[in-house]
Amino acid sequence: KTSMTDIAHQLAISTSTVIRKLNDFRFKHDFSRLPKIMSWDEYAFTKGKMSFIAQDFDNLNIITVLEGRTQAIIRNHFLRYNRAVRCQVKIITMDMFSPYYDLAKQLFPCAKIVLDRFHIVQHLSRAMSRVRVQIINQFERKSHEYKAIKRYWKLIQQDSRKLSDKRFYRPTFRMHLTNKEILDKLLSYSENLKHHYHLYQLLIFHFQNKEPEKFFGLIEDNLKLVHPLFQTIFKTFLKDKEKIINALQLPYSNAKLEATNNLIKLIKRNAFGFRNFENFKKRIFIALNIKKERTKFVLSRS
């Protein structure tokens, strides 16, 4: 995570020596084993170009970092593993990125795909946000309704169970109100907004309570009754039903790999970006795969 200039300063050597040592560094891929639980994701190496990363879910070791995320690049890498080794993989966690689905099943026939729960909720939240924007634009910009919804839009997006019950003076309404009372007023301005809000909250509730039957039952019952933006999301969810049910029934997610991606961003930021992908890859493996030995403190005897 430290820049090469800082490493050189700490070791009292030249920066060119640090760079030379980095160039000499080699990581050998072990193609004889794969973890039972693996996480897939992508990150931005350069502007406009996404790269692929796979991580061991349990010990957090990086399995591979590939320069691109195309199916050909990923397939060519994992086909270097024997089929028997690939069949040892039982779980793959990933974001909602459909090109990965068929590829994962081809390469790892025994693996279940688990979609990241955060991204499923994020899709619902974005659909609600876009519907809200379309509804608010039906009001005059100078109207009270437009100003109120625009001012308190976060209450519509928020989990209704987390609304504060503290009462404050609200200049927009010229009275003291709780967040729940404000929300009731906002929903009274549009039946369409109220319908989509209650549906959104119910879906979030069933999802967080890990009730797949109720979650998908609600989607199927309302598929033809909702805004096209919600219809698109609902159709995607129904297509990925098995993977979403896995996400609700199994205790795995992409959260650990997202944290790793934040460390990768830190490495990249400290270096002011990398022009050479191999050097970037080496820095990632050094920072994340080499475990530091803990210093054992010895108490001096008097």
PLM regions and their residue ranges:
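Short, positively charged, Gly/Tyr-enriched micro-motifs
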Residues: 1-38, 42-49, 86-89, 93, ...
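Acidic/histidine-rich catalytic cores and adjacent linkers
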Residues: 47-48, 52, 58, 67, ...
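Secondary-structure boundary/capping signal
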Residues: 15, 62, 111-112
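Non-catalytic alpha-helical coupling and interface elements of nucleotide-dependent molecular machines
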Residues: 3, 12, 23, 27, ...
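Mobile-element integrase/transposase regions
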Residues: 32-58, 62, 69-80
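Short alpha-helix plus adjacent loop in nuclease-associated cores
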Residues: 120-141
